[in-house]
Design a protein with these regions (language model features):
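DNA-contacting surface of Y-family translesion DNA polymerases
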Residues: 91, 99-242
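Gly/Gly-Pro- and Ser/Thr-rich, intrinsically disordered tail segments characteristic of DNA damage-repair
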Residues: 1-125, 129-132, 145
């Protein structure tokens, strides 16, 4: 916050910074400000930093994911369209496995293909989220930085009709929950590197387990693999009536 008061947490180790208007204050352009901030974090905290600089949240997040763990990428308005056009559709926030499969089945595999479509066509084919992904495909993201926002967690759970310890059934259910968590995290522009598992036994004993991965994620497969490790440690003769996963 020495650089700007407009800091919005994205996850425990990620944040958006709005550097609009800070050039006059610091007498430096945003790229230099961020380079100095990265150096300071490395020196004082001892962790690597990946920086993405752009004119909206969506592009800044994509930039920050390039060349991790010590990447520094910049996308300006002139470059945005060309940068996005060949990226796979799942890069778009809100495109989880189900929507990705629908798009792919329709022959749409890149962001550039969505950009070429009329917005009404995208909405007709894919529902309300069509407007959202069409705007992102055109590098449009009008969300503002919200400094007061607290780091959020996203979770889904389900209660079974019958208590069970069937491993295949539990893993199938876990995958479905992980997909839901992934889709919601993409829609909200959130990510996390702590995966939480919640299970309730047939005698109503609540068990919570968590695991931390190296990098924040929104990807269902990564969430699932981590949560599955936790689940398999708990499966025994005991039967479960509830299963939940969170990020």
């Amino acid at each position: 916050k020495e650089m700007t008061p407009l800091v919005e947490p994205l996850s425990l180790d990620e944040a958006f910074l709005d550097l609009s208007g800070t050039t006059r204050l610091h007498k430096k352009i945003p790229a230099v400000i961020l380079a100095e901030l990265s150096k300071k974090i490395i020196e004082k905290v001892g962790i690597s930093v990946s920086v993405g600089l752009s004119y909206n949240k969506f592009l800044a997040k994509i930039c920050s994911d390039i060349d991790k763990p010590r990447g520094f990428s910049i996308i300006n308005k002139k470059e945005a369209s060309n940068f996005l056009k060949d990226k796979p559709v799942e890069v778009l926030w809100g495109v989880g496995k189900t929507l990705k499969n629908k798009l792919n089945n329709d022959g749409i595999k890149t962001i550039g293909q969505i950009k070429e479509m009329e917005i009404n066509e995208v909405i007709t084919k894919y529902g309300a989220i069509g407007s959202h992904i069409h705007k992102l495909s055109n590098a449009e993201d009008n969300r503002v930085i919200k400094p007061s926002r607290k780091v959020k967690s996203i979770s889904h759970e389900t209660t079974f009709e019958k208590d069970t310890n069937d491993e295949d059934f539990l893993k199938k259910t876990l995958w479905s929950l992980c997909e839901k968590v992934s889709n919601r995290s993409k829609n909200k522009g959130l990510g996390g590197n702590t995966i939480n598992l919640k299970i309730k036994t047939k005698d109503f004993k609540l068990i919570s387990r968590s695991i931390t991965i190296d990098e924040p994620t929104q990807i269902a497969e990564i969430i699932f693999q981590a949560a599955k490790l936790l689940l398999l440690r708990e499966i025994n003769t005991n039967k479960f009536r509830l299963l939940g996963v969170g990020l």
